[in-house]
Amino acid sequence: MKKIVLFVFLSLSLLCFGEWEYIEENNSVRLVQENTMITLADGGGGVKTPIFHYTLEEILDSKKPINTYGIEITIDENPAIKANAMVMYRVMRFPVKDVTTDEEVFNELLPQMQNGKMMKIKFLTKKYSDILIEIPLDNFNESYQQMK
């Protein structure tokens, strides 16, 4: 079954960590923190490429686009994984459609998420200071296994 990944960040609050949970109604895995929701959902419909989808609400002016030159994702002590990213205002998508290297990056990333404890995503921006988000991966694998 093909997967599509939608990561939605409503803000960068790391004060209150939640747990990843399986949502049967839409065959997805979700983490809800105080002001942050992250979802890994089944794309269905023949969708080939998984996508990380980030929405940066509070740190950026909603009327100005983010100029980025990519992202770096680090899980635990593994080397940083670099990838392209497409940005439309406050929304960042990864991998970029039809960029094979990004699809390969995702295939490397998912097993690390299943075995890791903490994922750090660094948005490399041209206009703002780089943005770092930390996402706990405790019980991610257990929840993800229910999607298969």
Q: What kind of feature is each model-predicted range?
A:
Residues 17-148:
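A generic "folded-domain core" signal
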Residues 3-17:
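Sec-dependent N-terminal signal peptides
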